[in-house]
């Protein structure tokens, strides 16, 4: 009799246990929340104000991962320096299996895939392409579809629920993108300068050229000679908008303001929760679109 009572008491907890999801970034956590809603619990390892290339593999993260069903990452080696050590340190069989880490970027038509041999002399180059798809709303919609399928595999009873939510999110992203594209086109801004190649997908989606970075090479801090070259290019090509990711110091921005008349330098978030008031993927893209609009002719 006691055994039967214990089974009955434990059944609700088993039946309604929520999936425990970890993401490497706040951007992915925001998408997972849209797809999973009240049927999942999710936490992001990197903060929205952190450079996802450089996150400390803390023991506290390993403890959290011990009860996690799945880790979702952007991939393409963005988090490779720390996510694998964290997973191994957690000693969670669910995560060390081949399906424990779900990397998204490779499934989302990556851009800027380098050709030929790659050496460290070229900076922090990602062999599989640029991993920063979080600033492209269309790819975020596709990511939601991939996430819904994986969550449905883990919890088949909620498969239709996850799929419905992913469809809704993707539709919203598609509709918002059309409006954002119209606004950027109306702004007249066709080219910007950025610190790192974080904006490549954003620029590609919104038809903005962003071939000039303040970094001489990916992951290499700006040098005096390179900044002189950047200023020359900006004057020659009449670029008057600079977006500096708030992950990096912006002392270079002051120099650009001194050397280039009417230049607009904006320090902006590039992840959800990267600054107050940016708690969703939509709010992040909106923030960046407004930053571009501020540089209108």
Predicted regions and their residues:
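Positively charged n-region of N-terminal signal peptides that target proteins for export
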Residues: 1-4
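N-terminal signal peptide c-region/cleavage motif recognized by signal peptidases
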Residues: 10-12
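Extracytoplasmic metal-acquisition and chelation regions
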Residues: 18-297
